C-alpha cells in the first residue's frame, strides 16, 4: 500500500537499469512512493488492476506486450494517469500513445543532469494530478473534447486572415492531443500558414511533427531556419530553439537560453507574428500550465488581430489560457471542438465547403 499522502507509482520498463534509475529518482522525493515494477505491458495491466497506482511511467518497446497495447487496455478498463518515458528514437510512437490515452511524453532523464531530473519530477507530479477517464477501446480520430454549447459568434475583430494572415498557436500540457484534434477537425488546407510553439522535451518535436502530419490534411513539418512561410502549411518549433517570424515572412530560430523555463517560447513566436501580420494575425492559446503565451496574445490583441482561447471544459490544464482570458486578451473563448470552425471562418473558408 502507498504511504498516506504520497503519489503511488508503477514503473513499467523491460530494462532493469532504467527501472532502477527511475526508482532512485522517485525515492529521492518525499511525495512519491514506488509501489511496483513491471517488465512488460501484460504485467502492467494486471498490476494496475490490483494496485490502482496514482501514476504509471510507461516504456514503449517491451517483450510480450509493448506500451501502446498496454496503454489502450489500461485506459479502456481501469484508467490511471500514464506518463510515457521513452527514448527519442521512439518519438513518433510516443505521440501515438497519447492518442490512446497517455497524458504526456517525456524523455528518459539523464541522472547526471540535475535540471533534467528536476524537469522529469515536475512533469510526473503534474501528470499525476490530471483527472483521467475510461475511454472507448477504438478511436477513429483524436478526441475533440465535449459536445460544444452553441454560442452566437461575435463580430470579427479583424479582416479575414487568408490574405497575408498568419495563425500562431501556443500550447503546453495537453497540447499535442488538442493540436491533433484541431488539425483533424480543420480537415483541409487553410489559406494562410500556421506556426506552433508547443512545450515539449528536447528531441521529441520531430516525432510530434511526423505524428501530426499523419493526422492533418495540411503538411506539418519541423520549422527550419530561413524557411519561407507557405499558406496551408503547419510549422512546429523545435524545443531547442525559439522560433519567430521575420518581416519577410521567413522563419528565424534562436538558440534558447539555458535557464529558459518554457521550451520553446510561445511568447517569442506570437509576439513576432503580431509585429509581422498586425490585424491579420490570429493568436490561439490552448491548454497548458504556466503563463507562456499570455504576453504574445496581448501583443496580437493590441495589434488588432484576432485571438482565440480554448475553454476550461475541454482543457487538460486550464492555466496559460485561463490567464490570457482573465486579462482580456482572448476575444473568443471556445471549446476545442469549435476552434476549427472558427479558424475556417476567420481565414475566409466556408465551413460547409468541400476541401
Swiss-Prot record:
| EC number per UniProt | 3.1.1.61, 3.5.1.44
Residues found modified as 4-aspartylphosphate:
59
Q: Where is the CheB-type methylesterase domain?
A: 160-350
Q: Where is the Response regulatory domain?
A: 8-123
PTM summary from the entry reads:
Phosphorylated by CheA. Phosphorylation of the N-terminal regulatory domain activates the methylesterase activity.
Provide the gene name from the record.
cheB3
Which SMART domains did the record assign?
REC (SM00448)
**What is the protein name for this chain?**
Protein-glutamate methylesterase/protein-glutamine glutaminase 3
> Which species does the entry assign this protein to?
Paramagnetospirillum magneticum (strain ATCC 700264 / AMB-1) (Magnetospirillum magneticum)
Q: Does the keyword Cytoplasm apply?
A: yes
Member of which family? Answer: Belongs to the CheB family.
Amino acid at each position: 500500500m502507498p504511504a498516506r499522502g504520497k503519489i503511488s507509482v508503477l514503473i513499467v520498463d523491460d530494462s532493469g537499469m532504467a527501472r532502477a534509475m527511475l526508482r532512485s529518482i522517485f525515492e529521492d522525493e518525499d511525495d512519491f512512493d514506488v509501489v511496483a515494477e513491471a517488465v512488460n505491458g501484460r504485467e502492467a495491466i494486471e498490476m494496475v488492476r490490483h494496485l490502482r497506482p496514482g501514476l504509471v511511467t510507461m516504456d514503449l518497446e517491451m517483450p510480450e506486450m509493448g506500451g501502446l497495447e498496454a496503454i489502450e487496455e489500461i485506459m479502456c478498463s481501469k484508467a490511471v494517469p500514464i506518463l510515457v518515458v521513452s527514448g527519442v528514437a521512439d518519438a513518433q510512437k510516443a505521440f501515438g500513445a497519447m492518442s490512446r490515452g497517455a497524458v504526456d511524453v517525456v524523455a528518459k532523464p539523464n541522472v547526471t543532469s540535475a535540471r533534467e531530473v528536476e524537469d522529469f519530477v515536475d512533469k510526473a507530479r503534474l501528470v499525476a494530478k490530471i483527472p483521467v477517464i475510461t475511454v472507448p477501446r477504438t478511436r477513429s480520430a483524436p478526441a475533440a473534447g465535449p459536445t460544444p454549447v452553441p454560442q452566437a459568434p461575435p463580430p470579427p475583430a479583424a479582416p479575414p486572415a487568408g490574405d497575408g494572415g498568419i495563425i500562431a498557436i501556443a500550447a503546453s500540457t495537453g497540447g499535442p492531443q488538442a493540436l491533433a484534434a484541431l488539425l483533424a477537425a480543420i480537415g483541409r488546407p487553410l489559406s494562410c500558414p500556421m506556426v506552433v510553439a508547443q512545450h515539449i522535451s528536447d528531441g521529441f518535436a520531430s516525432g510530434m511533427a511526423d505524428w501530426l502530419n499523419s493526422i492533418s490534411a495540411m503538411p506539418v513539418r519541423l520549422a527550419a531556419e530561413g524557411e519561407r512561410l507557405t499558406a496551408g502549411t503547419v510549422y512546429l518549433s523545435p524545443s531547442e530553439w525559439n522560433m519567430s517570424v521575420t518581416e519577410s515572412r521567413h522563419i528565424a530560430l534562436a538558440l534558447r537560453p539555458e535557464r529558459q523555463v518554457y521550451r520553446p517560447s510561445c511568447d517569442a513566436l506570437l509576439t513576432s507574428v503580431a509585429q509581422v501580420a498586425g490585424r491579420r494575425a490570429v493568436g490561439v492559446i490552448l491548454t497548458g500550465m504556466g503563463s507562456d503565451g499570455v504576453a504574445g496574445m496581448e501583443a496580437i490583441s493590441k495589434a488588432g488581430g484576432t485571438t482565440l482561447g480554448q475553454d476550461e471544459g475541454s482543457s487538460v490544464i486550464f492555466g496559460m489560457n485561463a490567464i490570457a482570458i482573465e486579462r482580456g486578451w482572448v476575444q473568443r473563448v471556445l471549446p476545442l471542438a469549435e476552434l476549427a470552425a472558427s479558424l475556417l471562418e476567420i481565414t475566409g473558408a466556408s465551413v460547409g465547403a468541400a476541401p
